[in-house]
């Protein structure tokens, strides 16, 4: 799974599942879940020649593979289309009228397709369309919608920006998502998420779609391990005028992970470029640890990648390692 496959999967996959669980009646509800208290950050990790490849792998997977950003897709939940399609579905549902003549309500508990339930509340300005300030909330209780996943926990959505036609694929949509004790179980694996995320999707200039995600703190639990991303800012640009789809990713964040024994700061200096399911063929990002030591990861094309390791923090590489994305990702798995 690479950039093109995952994008901002956790939230948009959730949106598509919400639509399925709501039975098409509509979506809704104020975001009124409990406050999120992220764990304090630890010290920046010490980067050495021996641990640099694993650190590079953990950072790389946040951007291009089984990332924190998309962790709810790693249990097999499908991402719908180009990522923006699931949000488009929500727009269409809203355009089709949530509950005619009703601007605020708590719907009767909805049965999910296979088992479990979902409670839906909403407070909207105009039930006939989506508009600024609309609020939706979903509380899932072991909801199995028939896609093989079971969802529990809360998801609140507030529309913070919208422009376009709800009946078309060309729109600008900005959402604030709040996840509380949100879990997805599939094939015996459970992933959880908690935090607040801001998302914007701009598909007004087809065939290009721009997706931006930001969060001050967001925690994911998977395989019994919790990781937190702080100060996340990521922009993904997809161009479907070519096949496979051309994807560009620009990002910065701080990651706190028990796999690292500390924190790392990650930022792209040149946007990562890829086609379809391939690894990035161009771009670079730098991982900074304690005492300004760093690892710069440079895409060389195909499966090739270079690690420039600055051990003393003087801005010049002390060690250069030419390796592969496959090996870098294997290092992350072993961390």
State where each predicted segment sits:
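Low-complexity, intrinsically disordered segments exposed to solvent
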Residues: 27-335
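Bacterial N-terminal signal peptides that target proteins for export
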Residues: 1-10
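Bacterial signal peptide processing site
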Residues: 22-26
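C-terminal motif of bacterial Sec signal peptides marking the signal peptidase cleavage site
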Residues: 17-20
